[in-house]
Every structure is written in C-alpha cells, then in structure tokens.
Design a protein with these regions (language model features):
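N-terminal, membrane-interfacial amphipathic/helix-forming hydrophobic leader that caps
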Residues: 1-73, 144, 150-151, 211-254
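Alpha-helical transmembrane segments
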Residues: 2-14, 77-92
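Hydrophobic alpha-helical segments of integral membrane proteins
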Residues: 14, 58-63, 90-97, 187, ...
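Transmembrane helix-loop-helix hairpins at the membrane interface
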Residues: 15-18, 98-101, 105, 112-253
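N-terminal pre-catalytic segment of deacetylase/amide-hydrolase enzymes
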Residues: 40-41, 95, 99
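Short alpha-helical transmembrane interface motifs in multi-pass membrane proteins
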Residues: 41-42, 53, 81-88, 118-123, ...
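Glycine-/small-residue-rich active-site loops that bind phosphorylated ligands and cofactors
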Residues: 49, 79, 130
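Membrane-helix interface/capping segments
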Residues: 69-73, 102-109
Length: 254
C-alpha cells in the first residue's frame, strides 16, 4: 500500500514537472532564453528559478519514488557506456548545429562572449530537467505499466515536443524537428542503457552547440528578421549623413 502511494505521488510530481516545462517561456528559460526585440533579456534570477524549481521537483521525485534508478532510469548508468554514447550522439548534435548554421547564415554565427556562462547554465540545466522528466519519469512510468518500449519512446517524444511548444505557429521548423528527433533518440538511448546519463550528456552538448553555432538558445529568427539582416542594422547610425559621390570631382550637389 505504501509503495503504491509513493508511486502515485511520484506521478503527481511528474505532472508538475511537465507543467513547469510548459511554463518555460514565462521564465525566459530553455528555448526561450532569448533577448526581446529591443535587445533586453529577462531577469537572470527568473531564468535561474526555473532551473532550480526543476531540480527541486526532480529531487523530490528521487526521494518519493521507491526505486527511481531501476524503475525510472534517473541515474547515470554505466559510466563508460554513458560517456561513449553521450559524446557520440553529442558529436552528431554538434555536426547538425554547424550544418544548420552554415545553411541558414552561411557561417557559424557566434554569440557575444558575455552570453556564454548563462547559456551554458541554461543548456545543462534544461537538459537535466528534460531528461529526468521525459526520458526518466514519463518513459519509466510508461514502461512500468507494461507499454511496449517502442510505443513508450514515441509517446514520450511527442509529449516532450508538445511541452516545449516548438510546433506553435511562427516557431522555427528546424527546432520542431530537432526537438522531436532528439526526443526519440534520447528515449532510445535511455531504453538501451537503462538510465538517462547518455541522453543527458548528448542533449546538453546539442543544446549548447545550437547556441554557439546560431546565437540562439532555441528560437532562430526567420529569414530577414535577424538583427544583422534588418534595415536598422545596415543603415547609417543616427545623426550621420551619407555623402553621395557621382565622380572624382567631389560630392554631388542636391
């Protein structure tokens, strides 16, 4: 009876984790760690609070559930296997991020140096919360009730994609596909290894690589809408006057 009650409480915590993921935009965290149109970022402490709240809920899940490592896979797993598969799939994530940046911008669009610490914290924190929630709790509970592993992996990937809202109107198609495929591959890694260690490592590397290559945490602008593609960026600074030279005799008179 006590064990059943603890599993039900763990299920309730999982639901709160999914709700928290839905609310990432309000915190300016995860894919939404982006500056506004006027160039201002949300409060660092608001973004940090989302990560800390996620960590707290995952911690509560580990305490409440009778056996989170065996049933939910919320553990590193075999260290060598986790490192090998994590870095292997992480390398694929780096490659696709660079390929997308070269296709979209014609170059690697490195972000300003001062944004790296916050982006790395956001990437690692988001990867841990996501993997513990979707590849750990949700996938583990689906497998625990006897659902076929393939069906369970596909189900958690779709739930994950819905929770990130990357398929909403106006959002990047690239991020939608990356989120869905990433969820499927991370689920597969978790089933194969029996833990989320490899999936977490690959996820964190991929998320940080997308930021480094595109300058975005997860919301690449549509063509013509990046700051360097805007008319304001290409125009002369306010107060400057352009001189139109028609020939070598000097400026034209207008």
């Amino acid at each position: 009876m006590e064990e059943t009650l603890r599993v039900l409480v763990a299920l309730a915590i999982t639901i709160f984790l999914v709700i928290l993921r839905f609310e990432a935009e309000k915190f300016g965290a995860a894919e939404y760690d982006e500056p506004s149109r006027d160039g201002h970022r949300g409060s660092f402490f608001r973004r940090l609070s989302w990560i800390l709240l996620g960590f707290a809920l995952v911690g509560a899940l580990l305490v409440v559930h009778p056996d989170p490592a065996a049933d939910l896979g919320v553990a590193l797993g075999d260290r060598g296997e986790a490192l090998l598969l994590g870095f292997g799939f992480g390398a694929l994530g780096m490659f696709q991020a660079a390929a997308y940046a070269l296709f979209r911008y014609g170059r690697i669009r490195l972000p300003p140096a001062w944004t790296y610490p916050g982006a790395v914290l956001n990437g690692i924190g988001t990867a841990f919360v996501d993997e513990a929630t979707f590849r750990g709790a949700i996938l583990g509970l689906l497998l625990l009730v006897g659902i076929n592993p393939v069906t369970a992996v596909v189900t958690q990937a779709f739930v994950y994609t819905l929770a990130t809202r990357t398929g909403a109107p106006g959002r990047s198609h690239y991020m939608f596909v990356l989120t869905l495929v990433g969820g499927l591959l991370a689920g597969l890694l978790t089933v194969v290894t029996g833990a989320i260690g490899a999936a977490f490592l690959a996820h964190a590397i991929t998320r940080i690589s997308v930021f480094v290559c595109t300058g975005h945490a997860g919301q690449p602008a549509r063509r013509g809408e990046e700051i360097e593609e805007s008319w304001e960026y290409r125009a002369a600074p306010r107060g400057w006057h352009l001189i139109d030279r028609q020939d070598d005799d000097g400026p034209s008179k207008r």
